Amino acid sequence: MTKYVFVTGGVVSSLGKGIASASLAALLESRGLRVTLLKLDPYINVDPGTMSPFQHGEVFVTDDGAETDLDLGHYERFSSARMSKRNNFTTGQIYKSVIDKERRGDYLGGTVQVIPHITDEIKLSIREGAKGADVALVEIGGTVGDIESLPFLEAIRQMGFEDGPANTCFIHLTLLPYIPTAGELKTKPTQHSVKELREIGIQPDILLCRADREIPLDERRKIALFTNVRPEAVIEVLDADSIYKIPAMLHEQMLDEIVCHKLNILARAADLSVWKRLVDALEHPEHTVNIAFVGKYVDLTESYKSLSEAMIHAGMHTKSRVKIHYVDSEQIEKSGVDCLRGMDAILVPGGFGKRGVEGKIAAIRYARENRVPYLGICLGMQLAVVEFARDVAGMADAQSTEFDPTTNHPVIGLITEWLDRTGQVEKRSEQSDLGGTMRLGGQPCTLKNGTLAREIYGADSIVERHRHRYEVNNTLLSELEAKGLVVAGRAPGTELCEMVELPPAVHPWFVGCQFHPEFTSNPRNGHPLFISFVRAALAHQQKDSA
């Protein structure tokens, strides 16, 4: 029988429930338990796929093509569990499912209500997502007290009652703000947050208290007294300069032991040797590299969360501190590329819409002409093809039809047909809905022998995750290849272009990929593409300093 750990948050949002859940998952996994994680989001969108990055941050894509919350990226990076569409659901999905059932007549003419129909659907989704795990960690998005979260909180309250205290554990994450004028941490917000939770019918078993300084023992005892939580289960979570230090911080306060005891689980001692090695690599780099991220969502770096984490992982595996410089592509359009001088490498990530595109193309041109290592991801690959077509192949008006439908040289166009991960044919048109209609999830790619891509991956065939609706136009690709562009990877069956590069005689490291390799990078193994990219940046740095 699967046991459940429910993680809620109080006082303010963005306290780090996702990191806390992922860190606990890492601890339980190190004790030999099979773990999975679920994220319940209270917004009414069916998924975050059409939400602005400024509103939601990154959209994390799973192997099965689900567009999900960025916390699922943390789950995969901290544990060996692979996420799927069963691991993230929203109020929109729950209500849509219930309404569809009502329209089919599944409720036999009954009045459909929040309780029991919505809460039953939530419980069903949780149990489906938790199948096969010893422990399922379920994170409830939002903050206790939000009206949107109430059906989710009621559902987990019912699960606590149905499954019993030996099979459920409730963790509440709160904030202890420091008031400079008083010179002390304040516990009252935590007390009121727990009071609100208890009014709903949930008594937390463990409190994780965020603070920017050590919480005095007397204050912890006070919190325990007023919240009805055991003193040893009032755990401080101090601000850390790296999220990868959190598992050890929680383990030192015996969080995993407290959870196992609450759930009546006999498990081996935790082995954190891998995490200690990773933190040591993070804290003792031998080099520093400067990499420019040229994008349009740089004011909210959460939009590139998996990318920035993938660069940190690559740094761990190359003994390097990777210093990311976020560059607004619109600023390049206004002021030129001088801001890129001195960079050891340039990366252009994915994105949507015309704003800032010419600035990205200017950055790509700078990287190509100055032999600066370049990695283009998704739109970053497409724009590398556009830049090559314009400045090398002589197609002066080359563009993507996403930005100029009337161009005479549409080197990038809408994908109208492709094979999904199950081999079924998917078709799209300009009139298709925006939500859930992209080429999504894990897709195979065959690499060309003798290419840099083949050398980097060390394999003839790979599977990477995708999220796009535009692709390189095969009808013009032969002209670009004749001018020196190398197609390093193609999708079998459809021959869609998946990777491009420049020959080593022209450029030491210039690679574009249509997929998103950042979604499969983790601190334990890194990702070969990012590791090679950082090594190329180091080589460029050493060449410049010679």
UniProtKB/Swiss-Prot annotation:
Protein name as catalogued: CTP synthase
Active site: 378, 516, 518
Pathway: Pyrimidine metabolism; CTP biosynthesis via de novo pathway; CTP from UDP: step 2/2
Regulation: Allosterically activated by GTP, when glutamine is the substrate; GTP has no effect on the reaction when ammonia is the substrate. The allosteric effector GTP functions by stabilizing the protein conformation that binds the tetrahedral intermediate(s) formed during glutamine hydrolysis. Inhibited by the product CTP, via allosteric rather than competitive inhibition.
Domain of life assignment: Bacteria
Gene: pyrG
EC number: 6.3.4.2
Leading EC class: ligase
